[in-house]
Amino acid sequence: MSPARPCRGLRAVVAASMGLSEGPAGSARSGRLLRSPSPTPGARLLRLPGSGAGRAANPERGGWTEALRAAVAELRAGAVVAVPTDTLYGLACSASCSEALGAVYRVKGRSETKPLAVCLGRVADVYRYCHVRVPEGLLKDLLPGPVTLVMERSEELNKDLNPFTPLVGIRIPDHAFMQDLAQMFGGPLALTSANLSSQSSSLNVEEFQDLWPHLSLIIDGGPIGDGQSPECRLGSTVVDLSVPGKFGIIRPGCALESTSAILQEYGLLPSHGSCW
């Protein structure tokens, strides 16, 4: 397995290399980086251009690129960043930085026996970080999309990421900003929902404001979903694909029916149980 990479004390160097100025928490790096409202003056908020930032958005490339560069700089420095996805708001960090992984668990109050998913930018990247035992067409029919695919992990992943399981959940959100971010970052991102453990998931940045003081950067992509039905807070559908020829539903999530239909089109049979 890949060793953990150093990630402490790099923020100023990385920020300079990305063309960003380094300043105290809450300071503006440009006209688009805004001081967050009280009671969380330590948080920094960066709003994406346009209304929403999902697959249907037509972003202004200048502001879009600025947001990507700012997020990549923080992630490479070992920070935890709040991001919009196609299902919920999430917390992201470098999956190769053990200190950052620990910070995510502390911020959420999450048990370290619960796994973090890995977010990638392209289907081709899945083969680097997983031992894939399903047809490529199946992956492309499900990804990008509101699903987490659980497969056997490869030795490329940090040994401190979910050390209690040989499996890993893979996400490629159907969200333009997240795909661009993962590709620009150039490595696996650990991803989990932006909320305290056991509390409701978040569809806008205000709903996890209690976490802001513990985050380096908050990417505000606007509201996700309609916010009215309980189904919109279910998160991704989590599917175990670690057993050849079978699939197991770990979490029904928001796309159970369509996901199950695709799996069965490829001849996979339902099974029970998973160690992820």
From Swiss-Prot:
Localization, UniProt: Cytoplasm; Mitochondrion; Cell membrane
UniProt superkingdom: Eukaryota
This protein's record includes keyword DNA-binding: no
Biological process annotations from GO: negative regulation of transport; regulation of translational fidelity; tRNA threonylcarbamoyladenosine modification
Primary enzyme class: transferase
Stretch forming the transit peptide: 1-53
Ranges where the record places region Disordered: 22-60
Domain YrdC-like, first and last residues per copy: 65-255
Catalysed reactions, as listed in the record: L-threonine + hydrogencarbonate + ATP = L-threonylcarbamoyladenylate + diphosphate + H2O
Keywords, ordered alphabetically: Cell membrane, Cytoplasm, Membrane, Mitochondrion, Transferase, Transit peptide
Keyword Nucleotide-binding among UniProt keywords: no
A Pfam cross-reference name: Sua5_yciO_yrdC
GO CC field: cytoplasm; mitochondrion; plasma membrane
Bilayer topology term: Peripheral membrane protein
UniProt-listed Enzyme Commission number(s): 2.7.7.87
InterPro entries associated with the record: DHBP_synth_RibB-like_a/b_dom, Sua5-like_dom, TC-AMP_synthase_SUA5
Gene Ontology molecular-function annotations: double-stranded RNA binding; L-threonylcarbamoyladenylate synthase; nucleotidyltransferase activity; tRNA binding
Subunit-level organization: Interacts with RSC1A1.
Family classification: Belongs to the SUA5 family.
Job of this protein: Cytoplasmic and mitochondrial threonylcarbamoyl-AMP synthase required for the formation of a threonylcarbamoyl group on adenosine at position 37 (t(6)A37) in tRNAs that read codons beginning with adenine. Catalyzes the conversion of L-threonine, HCO(3)(-)/CO(2) and ATP to give threonylcarbamoyl-AMP (TC-AMP) as the acyladenylate intermediate, with the release of diphosphate. Participates in t(6)A37 formation in cytoplasmic and mitochondrial tRNAs. May regulate the activity of some transporters.
Domain free text: The mitochondrial targeting sequence (MTS) is weak and only mediates import of a small fraction of YRDC in mitochondria.
Descriptive protein name: Threonylcarbamoyl-AMP synthase
Organism classification: Eukaryota, Metazoa, Chordata, Craniata, Vertebrata
Gene expressing this chain: YRDC
